[in-house]
A protein has these predicted regions:
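Extracytoplasmic
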Residues: 70-72, 80, 90-94, 125-128, ...
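Hydrophobic beta-strand positions
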Residues: 76-77, 200
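Structural microenvironment flanking redox-active thiols in thiol-disulfide oxidoreductases
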Residues: 112-172
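Thiol-/selenol-based redox modules, centered on thioredoxin-like
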Residues: 184-234
Length: 234
């Protein structure tokens, strides 16, 4: 009886092992498929934005409506190398934009660390640049920005940290990038500008996305949207 019983046990055991291997394989395939889906764009074309509520406008890229849509105006600021930075610096570039200050003890460091992820993801991509505006330009001189860049591994000419005229920077942030969320509360130059938002700007200077610079899933979506925008411009 024992000689007959042991083979049966081995057969049952082999069937169970085979079942567990198949189950693990199926789970692995499902997980990989889930990851693949998450890396695709949400829509055929990213929306366009032109005001503080960030209501999406579904416009066909290259259309007359797109050409007449809100654009970020020209500016003249100075980066960590002491170079003058204007819109010409970003001609034919996709740009990720934010506002920060080097002495920020809280969220700015988290924002910088998340922006570093963007820098690393597109480090060798000549189409993608990063632009960070100091909201304390009287403190964040060229030398201070240079030290900050060195401290956090910011790549010169890939990621521009800029200082300049406070009024110009605040006007860009509030009137053109629409970065502050406290709608309904008028602000003037004396009111401090600070936001955790990242913005995605296309090659034609249009706002194509807004993202929480402190949120991991939002940063992941930004990376996906940058890749979608690159395909759109081909």
């Amino acid at each position: 009886m024992k000689k007959l019983y042991r083979p049966k046990i081995r057969v049952v055991f082999s069937v169970i092992v085979l079942f567990l291997i198949c189950l693990a394989s199926c789970k692995s395939k499902i997980k990989k498929e889930h990851i693949r889906i998450k890396k695709t764009a949400r829509v055929e074309h990213l929306p366009f934005f032109n005001e503080k509520t960030f209501t999406p406008h579904w416009i066909t890229p290259g259309s007359d409506q797109e050409k007449a849509f809100h654009k970020i105006p020209d500016f003249s600021l100075t980066n960590q190398l002491g170079e003058t930075i204007t819109q010409k610096t970003f001609d034919e570039k996709i740009v990720v934009v934010d506002f920060f200050f080097t002495s920020c003890p809280g969220i700015c460091l988290k924002m910088t660390n998340n922006m570093i992820k963007i820098q690393e993801e597109f480090k060798d991509d000549l189409e993608l640049l990063i632009l960070s505006h100091s909201v304390t330009p009287s403190i964040d001189s060229v030398s201070v920005l240079k030290d900050y860049a060195s401290k956090y591994g910011i790549i010169d000419n890939k990621w521009h940290l800029v200082t300049g005229d406070r009024e110009e920077i605040y006007s860009l942030g509030r009137d053109h990038y629409f970065v502050e969320n406290d709608l309904g509360e008028p602000k003037n130059l004396d009111d401090f500008l600070h936001t955790e938002n990242f913005l995605l700007i296309d090659k034609n200077k249009h706002i194509r996305g807004i993202y929480n610079g402190l949120n991991r899933s939002s940063i992941a979506q930004l990376i996906v949207d940058i890749k979608a925008l690159k395909k759109e411009s081909i």
